[in-house]
């Protein structure tokens, strides 16, 4: 019987399997950042251990890094805990080593799930882990990638392996052509709206279909990034020529004979025609409209043409209660049109949407509208995902488009995605955000987050409220 892409990568990396199904899985690439690594390095130090395979480690600082004040160097990190975590990472990498380290203030520094692919650290067929739940991003390359906890970070450092049980296979097929103005972000929000945040629990998702194949690698990364919001630890896309073209020539990519051998192997990284999936979900891309989350979970999402739901129309008591709680927190009334929702702040960035295509997408809308950020918007910020993305955007003049319209053009980092740094919402503020989570307090205590695409966020910044971006493309 044929195997799925997930089956193939899993089988290639299993070292041993116990009778209860627990397997020892070999890990090829370990991405490290400043938040979940200090305890792991300290554990190694206390046990007198070294990192088992230094060449597997690629590290950067991202969660705590400020997006302003870089001219002050480390003195620009005003929060003492943030500063300690960043300097501790510097010291730990100096002591234990890494294949590549992109520290704070360096040219290649950025969000770990942006710098991994752009440096060639993420390759097809790899097992990739990181102490961060959005490690699923790297599945866009036909890699088995997922987040791990801090104790597991230490375990991988010490043994280059991980204890895991194999998940079931879920195929999500998106066929057809997206309407103009709709993007990868709209696809994945629509998927989560359909399957819910628990729909992928216990599964590894393979995203497939003509709409997925039509996406660029950056679009595929956006989709895989939010596999975790759909309940799955990992999401994958089969390798094709786009994958190979993206990887070729990257800093850590193989070269010469090794490249030729790798490409030959990568060509096998797709599900066999007779592979069996445990579950299949299908979506029609032509029916996907620009998406906006209205509540406090990514599954609370509707199209821009819809209205805030009425809990009284929900028969299920648990769901009705969840809607009522979300409406209270979000300060919304049932029946309000989503395109009438005014915003206080706009955030374009995060590991979901901070790559060069996202910057171009947002800048194109701003340029097309030819207007300034609306007066009711207190702050509209654009945060590139890495130093290289920032550099490329500036070469293309995208920063000038944003700044001329009243946006703030920031330094790279996780920024307002999670309010672990200086960028955050104040209580009651409403934000159009290109990030991946809209939980209560995610962007700041009492902050209200609406997840959208970069184009939708840019249009909201200029109009002061959500609008249907299809009007402008």
Curated annotation (Swiss-Prot):
Binding site residues for [4Fe-4S] cluster: 351, 414, 417
InterPro entries xrefs: 3-IsopropMal_deHydase_lsu, Acnase/IPM_dHydase_lsu_aba_1/3, Acoase/IPM_deHydtase_lsu_aba, Aconitase_4Fe-4S_BS, Aconitase_4Fe-4S_dom, IPM_dehydratase_rel_enz, IPMI_cat
Cofactor info, note text: Binds 1 [4Fe-4S] cluster per subunit.
Pathway: Amino-acid biosynthesis; L-leucine biosynthesis; L-leucine from 3-methyl-2-oxobutanoate: step 2/4
Lyase is among the record's keywords: yes
Family to which this protein belongs: Belongs to the aconitase/IPM isomerase family. LeuC type 1 subfamily.
Organism field: Polaromonas sp. (strain JS666 / ATCC BAA-500)
CDD domains cross-referenced by the UniProt entry: IPMI
Co-factor requirement: [4Fe-4S] cluster
Protein name: 3-isopropylmalate dehydratase large subunit
General function of this protein: Catalyzes the isomerization between 2-isopropylmalate and 3-isopropylmalate, via the formation of 2-isopropylmaleate.
Recorded name of the encoding gene: leuC
Subunit structure: Heterodimer of LeuC and LeuD.
EC number per UniProt: 4.2.1.33
Short name of any one Pfam family annotated for the protein: Aconitase
Lyase recorded as keyword: yes
GO BP: any one term: L-leucine biosynthetic process
Top EC class for this record: lyase
Catalysis: reaction(s): (2R,3S)-3-isopropylmalate = (2S)-2-isopropylmalate
PROSITE patterns, alphabetized: ACONITASE_1, ACONITASE_2
Molecular functions per Gene Ontology: 3-isopropylmalate dehydratase activity; 4 iron, 4 sulfur cluster binding; metal ion binding
Keywords assigned by UniProt, alphabetized: 4Fe-4S, Amino-acid biosynthesis, Branched-chain amino acid biosynthesis, Iron, Iron-sulfur, Leucine biosynthesis, Lyase, Metal-binding
